[in-house]
Amino acid sequence: MQREKAQSRVAVYYELSKPKIWYLLVFTAFGAAVAASGIYGIEISIATWALMLFSVAAGSASANVLTNYHDRDIDAIMKRTQKRPLPSGRVTPAGARNFGLFLAGASMVMAACIALTTTPVQGAWAAAFIAFGLFNNVLVYSYMLKRRSRSNIVLGGLCGGMPPMIGWVAVTTADLWTMGLVMGGLVFIWTPMHIWALTLHFRDDYNKVNVPMLTAVHSEGTSARVIAVSTVAMALFSLAPLLITLEDGAAAVGPVYLATAAASGALIIALSAWVVYKPTEKAAWVLFKFSSPYLAVLFIALMVDAGLRA
């Protein structure tokens, strides 16, 4: 009985961390590390892998938990979120807050410890990226912007770009502010499209609690056009790696990434065009469900290209 209760408690806190979100972010960190390793021929130690992946997982989970803690009042009202651990009473507010703070501290420590398996500079950058991501997501987005500004997810979405940069800097600081930054930019620019498609689908829920998500407060037609513009921007930015020349003079990516970015970009633009043509919750939901695999495919292509280089 005690064992079953313990397992149930672990499962509830795991659910509270919103794993579907941090799985994708951890994957982008993994993809950036694999790409950097392949490009520069740098072997990544098991310890570095563990510190990098677990720090990103803990940091992302922490942001989700602390955001849920702050939003527990509106989550109890919105149909989409009423069954989450906090509004359903399966986790206490104090328990959620303490769990989130523990994860935040653990993520910072693990990121800083990358200095022990690589260089002090790499560890310092990894810890700085974790700290910025937490600050931007929890304080800037959740506490300052989410309930006040229609552009909340734009300014509050910078945190999404941190996992790929952590993955890159755990391998090398070379081209961190070119290729590493562009990888982070892929997630940052992808975020509004992804979230706006979700909020269009659940616009009534967001309006019920007076959260001014851009695609919830505007008409469906205007919202659909905003989503389409952000989708086109994402598809165009996904071609940015093709413009980058690395420090050794070589191109950052090759034909595999070009073909993947072009094909997947055309598909997601077509889906956004469907949302414009038929601005319904169903169309927005289809775009939302496709957006995560789309981002994952881009990072897979980056890894494959880097592997072919090696």
Swiss-Prot record:
It catalyses: heme b + (2E,6E)-farnesyl diphosphate + H2O = Fe(II)-heme o + diphosphate. One of its GO terms (biological process) is heme O biosynthetic process. GO terms for molecular function: protoheme IX farnesyltransferase activity. InterPro entries: Protohaem_IX_farnesylTrfase, UbiA_prenyltransferase, UbiA_sf. Pathway: Porphyrin-containing compound metabolism; heme O biosynthesis; heme O from protoheme: step 1/1. CDD domains: PT_UbiA_Cox10 (cd13957). Disulfide bonds: none annotated. Its EC number is 2.5.1.141. It is a multi-pass membrane protein. Pfam families: UbiA. Its main location: membrane. It is found in: Cell membrane. Gene3D superfamilies: UbiA prenyltransferase (1.10.357.140). GO terms for cellular component: plasma membrane. Keywords: Cell membrane, Heme biosynthesis, Membrane, Transferase, Transmembrane, Transmembrane helix. Coiled coil: none annotated. The chain crosses the membrane at residues 21-41, 46-66, 99-119, 125-145, 153-173, 180-200, 226-246, 256-276, 284-304. Belongs to the UbiA prenyltransferase family. Protoheme IX farnesyltransferase subfamily. Carbon 2 of the heme B porphyrin ring is defined according to the Fischer nomenclature. NCBIfam families: cyoE_ctaB (TIGR01473), PRK04375.1-2 (NF003349). Converts heme B (protoheme IX) to heme O by substitution of the vinyl group on carbon 2 of heme B porphyrin ring with a hydroxyethyl farnesyl side group. This is Protoheme IX farnesyltransferase 2. It comes from Cenarchaeum symbiosum (strain A).
